[in-house]
Amino acid sequence: MANETLKAGFDKYMAGVEAKLAKNPERANLEPNRLYTPLDIEGFDYEKDLGFPGEYPYTRGVQPTMYRGRFWTMRMYAGFSTAEESNKRYRYLLANGGSGLSCAFDLPTQIGYDSTDPMAEGEVGKVGVAIDSLADMEILFDQISLDQVSTSMTINAPASVLLCMYIAVAEKQGVSADKLRGTIQNDILKEYAARGTYIFPPKPSMRLITNIFEYCSKNVPLWNTISISGYHIREAGSTASQEIAFTIADGIAYVEAAIKAGMNVDDFAGRLSFFWNCLL
């Protein structure tokens, strides 16, 4: 009876505001309810549909206490010029409140060109730091203890190379790979679709990515092996709905490729991360 009364009141309310609502049409290609009431959750199962914090279906967060228990990492996207200059910037950021690093690489590094290659002329060190060798990587993280900081590297086609360099630098510091924390973007499918810093065709690129999944699951277990990215897709002109759809489709493709390569989904899925624009 209470719901019948509520429905009658709701219908009366909506009839009175339809004219005003018509002046502001939705732009997200969706038709959400204009007002939500208990009528919308009839048959709602608390444990199945909402759940508890930190438990499936994760509608209330992936951790029981979320940022109240562990604050999110503060990292500023940075990298420019030479490894020496970027190292100074990283150490400055860590000394002034940063709790992690986010590495930007120049375009030649992103597409596998050495800084001395004629194709790299005019682009070296312009939108990120130039990394040509392990020596550059050692300079980039000089005086930074890699077991004390997590590092995000925005690198895709040559992600396996930069990750290997990072592990090698850590070993020279006396830090074992299983202590390293961080993320590589490693999302080549969105490069084909929206951004363009790819090197190899899709099939061998996917093999490199699944190889990274497998290697890290065994040797670098705290490392996020991919950041499946919708942000770039949205910036390239998609709607919010398209961004979600294409990014989830990319994620499914990565999971299917890894399973096809013989991996157990539980061995790698926990280290798949996402990077969205549509939440902003």
Regions found by a protein language model. Name each.
Residues 1-279:
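Catalytic alpha/beta active-site cores
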